[in-house]
């Protein structure tokens, strides 16, 4: 057999040469776990005569990726082989790569089609020696295999279909796209991003430095008018934004309902659904930048709208096709009054906005007053509130939607109160900003890699968390996101108008679960809950401090006066809570009142679905969904085991093929293994094994530092009306803005596992550990310089105030009393209202407290999202 070299020469396949290359790339890995000869044997078995060296490297990388379930170091080795292969195929010098991308001629048209803007090209040419020498290519080898494949698939720029960028080139391009000719800031951003302290959001990675640098992730659009002109102007705006990789949140409360009178034609309206289907087809047609990812719109509607029942069902897999829009995401913008009526089993009146104008323009007491006046005037149709609630829960169990966002909490606890009523969130329900027909709200995102701040002592005995460094990095990101506002390409003028006036930004996080596992803190532990508060207090303080410093240099944002912050009111003040005590808030508060802020909003933890894959961490602030899962790449599907768990089981001496097969049969859970220490069972609980009450409590703990909102998913193995009702009401009473992004449920029935030998899997429970305990660093809590100076008094005061300032009402409603002492996944529901329901038979079926697991209503359950997991 022979291999074809990159220069076209033929050379015999040499076993020793492959082994030598594998060994060379295994530096720093565990020599007792990495078997270069075994890897080479597997590679040779897949080689054919005439294979190219590129194909050989790809085969080697895939072979190591498949062996990740043997030891986590194989994942590192797979990445090194793949990245080494890319380095051989690409130009090393950054300035030359930029030149090639800028000078590209499209072979199909023969025309100049630059992928890099003239501005960035000129900056690189003027500073090429500095920039070329600053790049550290060894940092490419820190990516995981699947992180690198994610970059390769969607993020690295290509020439003639072939990848032209290296990961370090991308990072430098992003830094230049943000900071332009400010080379000092460019190098600072490059170094921190390449060292994996943080990442900017996908649109920034896609588009920074290109001729149309649309770097914003989120756009909140107002339906311009209830007319053909207004609807289609809005549709065009959505298409223009989606074309440049923006996600869309659109509120449609002002569109009249089915059967409403149309004066212009003397006819009646077809209602929301036919219009929604037009938006659905636009989302399908306009992908985000050449199939990098599909277009995505979320539609927000308040539950008083007369078409609400059809709206919540638009993603169902069954029913008439003409009333479905499965590529859109329905979301509810819920006033407190609706939740009260459901809780009381009271009436709820549905209106057409043409008959009951202005309901979406007011919130709180003003909304209640206007809504009840319209009810008294008989302008709508009255139903039981629980009938609508039942329909919402039924849709959520089948499709995971509609999303739940609480209108009054969003408007009551925002620094944009002085702008007007906020009417929607964004696609992922973490951005909460004011929008109007002439202002499309925009937000630029970045996420901090929380595991980067875990520090282990030199002797390996203790581990701690570096809050000072976290604070420092969060300030750098704030400066970056603020600069994106000025350097961004805006696809529509309404977006530029809004962003330049209010200048909101959004910092998020990724890898909170990884951080807990590195520090050996179970997700439900008190230490983990304390660290959760400390991390988010630190980031919030850093963003405000940086924004205040920017205001002193560049001026406050134009609508600062009249905002809560201008009066010294910060996010935790709006919750009637006091901060944990890590930082000096009083000095910062005075500085903000005196100098202002450069940005109206700064915090919004987002899902980080793609970027967390790049850095190799768990998404945002969520627990792990499984300790074993599949990763799909173009070449196939790979099994991946939680690397922290895998390392522990390997070191205990109980990891082998039977343990792997056991994990597959148990959907990644280790709770049923008698030979695994209880300490590990607690540490590696999946989200399905963690109390949802804990998830919501931790969300509320961090929410007092989040001036927008955060994308909170809820998880239930066996959803029932009672459980979902309990979760929603608990979150609402805790004061959350986003009550639920997706409802995640497990498959109703497990797929037949043809590849599993059950006898082999059963052997996993019989293994005996070779060591009695693992040698792992012990977490030592640390504060900041400020908190250490005032440790005793600050922590005691914080603890007392948090108890006093709990946003949960003290009165015991049927819902809150049931929630006080139970886990949300337990089969204990709020009490059924005592009054007799004197309605028609349809109303009697709507038992929102039923504990029976909800059965799928789809005629073909295999097509249902919930049933298929």
Curated annotation (Swiss-Prot):
Binding site for dTTP: 226-228, 243, 256, 263-264
InterPro entries named in the record: ATP-cone_dom, NrdE_NrdA_C, RNR_lg_C, RNR_lsu_N, RNR_R1-su_N, Rrm1
Site (Important for electron transfer): 741-742
Region described as Disordered: spans on this chain: 793-843
Main location (coarse class): cytoplasm
Keywords from the named record: Allosteric enzyme, ATP-binding, Cytoplasm, Deoxyribonucleotide synthesis, Disulfide bond, Isopeptide bond, Nucleotide-binding, Oxidoreductase, Phosphoprotein, Ubl conjugation
Subcellular location: Cytoplasm
Residues in cross-link Glycyl lysine isopeptide (Lys-Gly) (interchain with G-Cter in ubiquitin): 387
Site (Interacts with thioredoxin/glutaredoxin): 864, 867
Domain ATP-cone stretches: 1-92
Regulation: Under complex allosteric control mediated by deoxynucleoside triphosphates and ATP binding to separate specificity and activation sites on the large subunit. The type of nucleotide bound at the specificity site determines substrate preference. It seems probable that ATP makes the enzyme reduce CDP and UDP, dGTP favors ADP reduction and dTTP favors GDP reduction. Stimulated by ATP and inhibited by dATP binding to the activity site.
EC code(s) of this entry: 1.17.4.1
Role: Provides the precursors necessary for DNA synthesis. Catalyzes the biosynthesis of deoxyribonucleotides from the corresponding ribonucleotides.
Additional note from the record: Two distinct regulatory sites have been defined: the specificity site, which controls substrate specificity, and the activity site which regulates overall catalytic activity. A substrate-binding catalytic site, located on R1, is formed only in the presence of the second subunit R2. Present with 1364 molecules/cell in log phase SD medium.
Protein name listed in UniProt: Ribonucleoside-diphosphate reductase large chain 2
Organism, as annotated: Saccharomyces cerevisiae (strain ATCC 204508 / S288c)
Originating gene: RNR3
């Amino acid at each position: 057999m022979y291999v074809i070299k990159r220069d076209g020469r033929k050379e015999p396949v040499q076993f020793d040469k492959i082994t030598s290359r594998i060994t060379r790339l295994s530096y720093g890995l565990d020599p007792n776990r990495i078997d270069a000869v075994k890897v080479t044997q597997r590679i040779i078995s897949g080689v054919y005569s005439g294979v190219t060296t590129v194909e050989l490297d790809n085969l080697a990388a895939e072979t190591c990726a498949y062996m990740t379930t043997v030891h986590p170091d194989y994942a590192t080795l797979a990445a090194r082989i793949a990245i080494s292969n890319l380095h051989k195929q690409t130009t090393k010098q950054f300035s030359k790569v930029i030149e090639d991308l800028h000078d590209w001629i499209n072979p199909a048209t023969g025309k100049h089609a630059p992928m890099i803007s003239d501005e960035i090209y000129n900056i690189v040419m003027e500073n090429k020696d500095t920039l070329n020498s600053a790049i550290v290519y060894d940092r490419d080898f820190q990516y995981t295999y699947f992180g690198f494949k994610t970059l390769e698939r969607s993020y690295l720029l290509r020439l003639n279909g072939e990848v032209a960028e290296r990961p370090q080139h991308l990072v430098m391009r992003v830094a230049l796209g943000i900071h332009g000719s400010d080379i000092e800031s460019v190098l600072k951003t490059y170094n921190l991003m390449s060292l994996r302290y943080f990442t900017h959001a996908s649109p920034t990675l896609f588009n920074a430095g290109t001729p149309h640098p649309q770097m914003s992730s989120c756009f909140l659009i107002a339906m311009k008018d209830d007319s053909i002109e207004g609807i289609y102007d809005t549709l065009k705006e959505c298409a223009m934004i989606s074309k440049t990789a923006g996600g869309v949140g659109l509120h449609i409360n002002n569109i009249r309902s089915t059967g409403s009178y149309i004066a212009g034609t003397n006819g009646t309206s077809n209602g929301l659904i036919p219009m929604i289907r037009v938006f659905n087809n636009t989302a399908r047609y306009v992908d985000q930048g050449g199939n990098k990812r599909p277009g995505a719109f979320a539609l927000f509607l308040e539950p008083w709208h007369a078409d609400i029942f059809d709206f919540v069902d638009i993603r169902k897999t069954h029913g008439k096709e003409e009333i479905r829009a499965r590529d859109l995401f329905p979301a509810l913008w819920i006033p407190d009054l609706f939740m009260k009526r459901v809780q009381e089993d009271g009436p709820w009146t549905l209106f057409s906005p043409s008959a009951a104008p202005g309901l979406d323009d007011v919130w709180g007491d003003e909304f209640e007053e206007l809504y009840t006046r319209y009810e008294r005037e008989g302008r709508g149709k009255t139903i039981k509130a629980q009938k609508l609630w039942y329909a919402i829960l039924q849709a959520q169990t089948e499709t995971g939607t509609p999303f739940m966002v609480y209108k009054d909490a969003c408007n009551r606890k925002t620094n944009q109160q002085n702008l007007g009523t906020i009417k929607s969130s964004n696609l992922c329900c973490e951005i909460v900003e004011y929008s109007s027909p002439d202002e499309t709200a925009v937000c630029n995102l970045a996420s901090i890699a929380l595991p980067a701040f875990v520090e282990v002592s030199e002797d390996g005995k203790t581990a701690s968390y570096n809050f000072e460094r976290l604070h420092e990095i969060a300030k750098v990101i704030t400066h970056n996101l603020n600069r994106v506002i000025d350097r961004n390409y805006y696809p529509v003028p309404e977006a530029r108008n809004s962003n330049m006036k209010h200048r909101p930004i959004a910092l998020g996080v990724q890898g909170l679960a990884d951080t807990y596992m590195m520090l050996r803190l179970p997700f439900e532990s008190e230490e983990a809950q304390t660290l959760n508060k400390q991390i988010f207090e630190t980031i919030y303080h850093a963003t405000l401090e940086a924004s205040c410093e920017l205001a002193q240099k560049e001026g406050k944002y134009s609508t600062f006066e009249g905002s809560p912050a201008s009066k010294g009111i910060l996010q935790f003040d709006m919750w009637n809570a006091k901060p944990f005590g890590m930082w000096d808030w009083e000095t910062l508060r005075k500085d903000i009142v005196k100098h202002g802020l450069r940005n109206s909003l700064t915090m919004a933890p987002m899902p980080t679905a793609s970027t967390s894959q790049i850095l190799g961490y768990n998404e945002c602030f969520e627990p792990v969904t499984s300790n074993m899962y599949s990763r799909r790449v173009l070449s196939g599907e790979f099994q991946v085991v939680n690397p922290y768990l895998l390392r522990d089981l390997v070191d205990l001496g109980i990891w082998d093929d039977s343990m792997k097969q056991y994990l597959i049969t148990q959907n990644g859970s280790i709770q049923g293994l008698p030979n695994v220490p209880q300490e590990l069972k607690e540490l590696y609980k999946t989200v399905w094994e963690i109390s949802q009450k804990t998830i919501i409590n931790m969300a509320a703990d961090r929410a007092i530092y989040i001036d927008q909102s955060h994308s909170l998913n809820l998880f239930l193995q066996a959803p029932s009306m009672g459980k979902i009702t309990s979760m929603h009401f608990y979150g609402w009473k805790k004061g959350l803005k986003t009550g639920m992004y997706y409802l995640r449920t497990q498959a109703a029935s497990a797929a037949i596992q043809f590849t599993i030998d059950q006898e082999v899997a059963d052997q996993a429970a019989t293994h005996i550990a070779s060591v009695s305990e693992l040698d792992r660093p012990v977490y030592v809590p640390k504060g900041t310089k400020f908190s250490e100076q005032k440790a005793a008094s600050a922590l005691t005061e914080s603890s007392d105030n948090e108890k006093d300032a709990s946003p949960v009402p003290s009165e015991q409603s049927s819902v809150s009393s049931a929630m006080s002492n139970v886990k949300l996944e337990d089969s204990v529901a709020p009490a059924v209202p005592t009054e007799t329901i004197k309605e028609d038979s349809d109303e009697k079926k709507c038992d929102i407290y039923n504990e029976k697991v909800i059965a799928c209503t789809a005629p073909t359950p295999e097509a249902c999202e919930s049933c298929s997991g």
